[in-house]
Amino acid sequence: MRASKANAYVAAIDQGTTSTRCIIIDDTGAVVSVAAKEHEQILPQQGWVEHDPVEIWDNVRAVVSQAMVAIDITPYEISSVGVTNQRETTVIWDPATGEPVYNAIVWQDTRTNEICRELAGEEGQQKWLDRTGLLINSYPAGPKIKWILDNVEGVRERAEKGELYFGTMDTWLLWNLTGGIRGDDGEEALHVTDVTNASRTLLMDIHTQQWDPELCEALDIPMSLLPEIKPSIGDYRSVRHRGILADVPITGVLGDQQAALFGQGGFKEGDTKNTYGTGLFLVMNTGPELKISEHGLLSTIAYQIEGQDPVYALEGSVSMGGSLVQWLRDSLQMIPTAPAIEEFARQVPDNGGVHIVPAFSGLFAPRWHPEARGVITGLTRFANRNHICRAVLEATAFQTREVVDAMARDAGKELESLRVDGAMVQNELLMQMQADILGIDVIRPGDIETTALGTAFAAGLGSGFFKDFDQIIELISIRQTWTPEMTEAERERAYDAWNEAVTHAYPR
């Protein structure tokens, strides 16, 4: 029989948009076990995206058990556990029964557009930006809460009586992990969130890290619904679920993009990462000073260690990244698989004058033009599939540059390099394009699944499993670095052509 060793590992639960994962790492930062399970995407009508919170909780239990069984360990051997999650996705439930009053409304869901238009018209964007760091749009949780209160029968009345809880997905999982309705030891389960998730609701004053009564009133949300806000890294409570991770301390909670920055070792002011997933998510550590963007970005909290002031960040999100490649594959059927785009794009030396502006749902950061629509410009009889494939990859790189330039203006200094992660960074042509279009080095780590890894690092820091940031940085390996090969003149000529193409996406 294998001898068990106390506190030899750290676990991380990564609850994402399409699946839930559990990873377990050792003290070298190596991932020793992984388990994952997808959940259903519920699409009741166009623009609506929902998840079943109960299914997700069931999947959490399943993947944690699978990851532990795979390496034959017990909770005794796990020092601590961290939780990361798809941000903004909204759940309201009855703590007396554990039953959600409605499906989780996912961050991608756009049903709250009309609520947001009315809110922006009444209050103006600047007030919300100055107070929360966010712009009023369909992403944050606040408008989703209001929609559930206004549209699900009986929910507003129950909320006003204090009978219901709201949470983003971290809050829902923490409540279940710490006992839920069972209360094995008679103690109430935690109803908490961390500052990074709270900062994505439109309800938290980013200056004080507390819920803002005036903002809650503007959205007509009872404050009794809201969880307690806690630092990202510190002592939450031990797991009180007999089935999984019994008595393991929860010591780290982060929203997914902040967790990815943590997993990249983005601890210094100016450190910046881009996650190339369904969309593109750029986050820059701006240090202890809050910077409210003047160039179309959002301000958020990168992380907070218990007993310390928060560390802030600038964020720019682009809606179309990997999803543009999926569109090429599934809707146009132009490529057989997503990875095949690189092979086709390499067949030509340039885009042949073709540009694709993927404003399928408008343009997001830093332009924020919801009425823009996707266009393909520069088509001639000379253009072929290879040129279009190249234009798709270039669109990803150009959109990233737009956000990077905005970050540099807000931060008052140029980026020295960009750290990258996510599935698309396996496309080496795209990464070279990115270095060329930015004019800086692009750095890919050894493990590109940095969201789960960053959560494990945060939990390990919170429990003392890892000593400090320096130790964590030593554990992060660099797999590859791309350096610019374009001249400055070539770079700016290409960027000017992109900007010209974007003008055709605007309504006339």
Curated annotation (Swiss-Prot):
SUPFAM superfamilies: Actin-like ATPase domain (SSF53067). GO terms for molecular function: ATP binding; glycerol kinase activity. ATP binds at residues 17-19, 278, 322, 326, 423. Its EC number is 2.7.1.30. PROSITE patterns: FGGY_KINASES_2 (PS00445). Inhibited by fructose 1,6-bisphosphate (FBP). It comes from the Bacteria. It is an enzyme of class 2 (transferase). Sn-glycerol 3-phosphate binds at residues 17, 87-88, 139, 256. Pfam families: FGGY_C, FGGY_N. Signal peptide: none annotated. Glycerol binds at residues 87-88, 139, 256-257. It catalyses: glycerol + ATP = sn-glycerol 3-phosphate + ADP + H(+). Pathway: Polyol metabolism; glycerol degradation via glycerol kinase pathway; sn-glycerol 3-phosphate from glycerol: step 1/1. Keywords: ATP-binding, Glycerol metabolism, Kinase, Nucleotide-binding, Transferase. GO terms for cellular component: cytosol. One of its GO terms (biological process) is glycerol catabolic process. ADP binds at residues 17, 21, 278, 322, 423, 427. Key enzyme in the regulation of glycerol uptake and metabolism. Catalyzes the phosphorylation of glycerol to yield sn-glycerol 3-phosphate. Belongs to the FGGY kinase family. This is Glycerol kinase. It comes from Corynebacterium efficiens (strain DSM 44549 / YS-314 / AJ 12310 / JCM 11189 / NBRC 100395). The lineage of its organism: Bacteria, Bacillati, Actinomycetota, Actinomycetes, Mycobacteriales. The gene is glpK.
